[in-house]
Amino acid sequence: MYKLLKKSGKARRGEFTTPHGVIQTPVFMNVGTLAAIKGAVSSMDLKEIGCQVELSNTYHLHLRPGDEVVKKMGGLHKFMNWDRPILTDSGGFQVFSLSKIRKIQEEGVYFNSHIDGRKIFMGPEESMRIQSNLASTIAMAFDECVENPAPREYVEKSVERTTRWLHRCKDEMNRLNSLPDTINNKQMLFGINQGGTYEDIRIEHAKTIAKMDLDGYAIGGLAVGESHEDMYRIIDAVVPHLPEDKPIYLMGVGIPSNILEAVDRGVDFFDCVLPARNGRHAHVFTKEGKINLLNAKFELDDRPIDEGCQCPACKHYTRSYIRHLFKAKEMLAMRLCVLHNLYFYNNLMEEIRDAIDGDYFKEYKERKLKEWGGRA
């Protein structure tokens, strides 16, 4: 259940109560594709750096180790030793982005595994069953993420099919949640708004799915090559047509400036691999924007990554030392930078929540954008 606590302009401060705890929103979900953050970050680390929600990938876990294995091990929470909320995506995005050979039909999608090439089928019911086996807190509906740009006629047909799939997802989840051997029989379902960059298609789809009384609503199919202006335009068009008493999730968007702009437009949930991926390549976020620790100017820099930061890396190590670790190809380098970046994001969201609570979010946003100077 979502409770709206405060608004600052259109920015929303809320609480989302789940079977695995209360999520303070706006929130950034830390992405652990295979039930772990790439970069040797443990579930204990995630708690230390303020992670509220972990996100895992249905498609990848279905292939390895297999959702049946996870179910036999008691579900994702027990498997990865994490007692806070977990969101699993539906696998739809990976089916359409990773598989070069796929066939879309009304019942679902036939595609080839990106690992061994074997033929796999996934539809709404299969996605729900896999996510039920994983026993995540929040399951995402199975949808088609169309390429951008895509012909209007195709987008219209795709959105209609995605709506039919959403009804099937809801029916299947209700069935699964009623079974005696279901680990999490209070699993929640978020629907996904699609429609490419066509505002009218997006709006009609938002109105349609808003009637279904789901636990939350996502805006999908963005951050796939469109301009930031197009992204903001679509968010502006869609958000007013989604229920105000449900959380709104902008999928796959994680550039800090994009997060601020989306919060300013009423978005509550975010996720992205960006902070962890950047950290693994020595790109770290600071109050002044993003820097590359491999640059020669940091060789003798005895400052922490970001002065004043309370993450494990900044409390104990210098830019010079971490740069040396990267040059020496030591795994500790990746770990420290991933921890720092995730802490930066989680702390950013805490500052955003405080700014909305204090009704100074607009001023906060403008100050942060000025500090970053287009470097974040």
Curated annotation (Swiss-Prot):
Its cofactor is Zn(2+). It comes from the Bacteria. It comes from Clostridium botulinum (strain Loch Maree / Type A3). The keyword Chaperone does not apply. Homodimer. Within each dimer, one monomer is responsible for RNA recognition and catalysis, while the other monomer binds to the replacement base PreQ1. This is Queuine tRNA-ribosyltransferase. The gene is tgt. It is an enzyme of class 2 (transferase). Zn(2+) binds at C309, C311, C314, H340. The lineage of its organism: Bacteria, Bacillati, Bacillota, Clostridia, Eubacteriales. The active site is at D89 (proton acceptor), D271 (nucleophile). GO terms for cellular component: cytosol. It holds the Pfam family TGT. It catalyses: 7-aminomethyl-7-carbaguanine + guanosine(34) in tRNA = 7-aminomethyl-7-carbaguanosine(34) in tRNA + guanine. HAMAP family: Q_tRNA_Tgt (MF_00168). Its EC number is 2.4.2.29. GO terms for biological process: queuosine biosynthetic process; tRNA wobble guanine modification; tRNA-guanine transglycosylation. Keywords: Glycosyltransferase, Metal-binding, Queuosine biosynthesis, Transferase, tRNA processing, Zinc. SUPFAM superfamilies: tRNA-guanine transglycosylase. Substrate binds at D89, S90, G91, G92, F93, D143, Q194, G221. Catalyzes the base-exchange of a guanine (G) residue with the queuine precursor 7-aminomethyl-7-deazaguanine (PreQ1) at position 34 (anticodon wobble position) in tRNAs with GU(N) anticodons (tRNA-Asp, -Asn, -His and -Tyr). Catalysis occurs through a double-displacement mechanism. The nucleophile active site attacks the C1' of nucleotide 34 to detach the guanine base from the RNA, forming a covalent enzyme-RNA intermediate. The proton acceptor active site deprotonates the incoming PreQ1, allowing a nucleophilic attack on the C1' of the ribose to form the product. One of its GO terms (molecular function) is tRNA-guanosine(34) queuine transglycosylase activity. NCBIfam families: Q_tRNA_tgt (TIGR00430), tgt_general (TIGR00449).
